[in-house]
Amino acid sequence: MAFRLKLVPEKTNFDFFRWQWATFGAAIVMMIASVILPLVIGLNFGIDFKGGTTIRTESTTAIDVGVYRAALEPLELGDVIISEVRDPSFREDQHVAMIRIQMQEDGQGAEGQGAQGQELVNKVETALTAVDPALKITSFESVGPKVSGELVWTAVWSLLAATVVIMFYIWVRFEWQFALGAVVALVHDVLLTVGLFAVLQLKFDLTTVAALLTITGYSINDTVVVFDRLRENLIKYKTMPLRDVMNLSVNETLSRTVMTGMTTLLALVPMLIWGGDVIRGFVFAMVWGVFTGTYSSVYVAKNIVLFIGLDRNKEKKDPSDKFFSNGAQDGAP
């Protein structure tokens, strides 16, 4: 006998429009707040966006990240990230670590020029050899403010490019009203994540940008499922009011939406608890993104489409249907 876990019944009849203005209004308010908060409070940019120095160390003894971190704390270097590098090509007694240190206030340290850059490396080497005499610094490099500024703009353009591509896909797959609803939902998810990072002053670096891109993919996947069912129901229930068709479509896909979110959280929560500092920012953003993505799929995207309206009297067979037909039209009454 097969065991099936059901968090939500297959057939539900919730009225997702009952508190329409409250749920949609809350989303708009949070989006506006998420734009203002980073400007007022500021984001806690990581080394990728502030600039800093990366030091590569090598030792014949096993690496203890906690011991390394404790040894560097008296130096008061600010943001320090220590990670062990593993590679099958390494010898059995070859242990490599990467140490990333934020740009110091007393000097740029860019490209390791001058006494200041070398002084930083010497301080780190002295502190670490005290706890691991076999340790050697094999290389180091620095990222200056100019390069880190370019990384910020690259991150922004990558998010904008992803949004444009997704909007084009939804436009071709469905209609422009659906594309606009999906993009507003994506912007909602990204802005709320950035706003939360500003409020909590969590480290915002390239891994966070990767999480934002992943959130957009997760969110659009949820939204497309709802929109696809909505399109099928619009053909099936031609005389039903648009609001009722939308509510029916959300109810019919609710079980899938909840199960997808729960299974994703089952993988993310253990990583958030035991994954360590290196990936904690990425995982935290993803956990938050699961909730915002689910909320936007249910309460944001459909409200945009409802507000704009759909022309249900036009001919259903668009050119796009030739490429993306799922057979729903053939079996529709």
UniProtKB/Swiss-Prot annotation:
This protein's record includes keyword S-adenosyl-L-methionine: no
GO CC aspect terms? plasma membrane
Membrane topology, from the record: Multi-pass membrane protein
Chief place where the protein resides: membrane
Annotated keywords: Cell inner membrane, Cell membrane, Membrane, Protein transport, Translocation, Transmembrane, Transmembrane helix, Transport
Q: Which Gene3D superfamilies match?
A: Multidrug efflux transporter AcrB transmembrane domain
Superkingdom is Bacteria
Membrane spanning residue stretches: 27-47, 152-172, 180-200, 207-227, 253-275, 285-307
Per UniProt, subcellular location reads as:
Cell inner membrane
GO terms, molecular function: protein-transporting ATPase activity
| UniProt keyword Repeat present | no
Alphabetical list of InterPro entries matching this protein: SecD/SecF_arch_bac, SecD/SecF_bac, SecD/SecF_CS, SecD_SecF_C, SecD_SecF_C_bact, SecF_bac
Q: What does the subunit comment say?
A: Forms a complex with SecD. Part of the essential Sec protein translocation apparatus which comprises SecA, SecYEG and auxiliary proteins SecDF-YajC and YidC.
| Protein name as annotated | Protein translocase subunit SecF
Tell me which species this is from.
Rhodobacter capsulatus (strain ATCC BAA-309 / NBRC 16581 / SB1003)
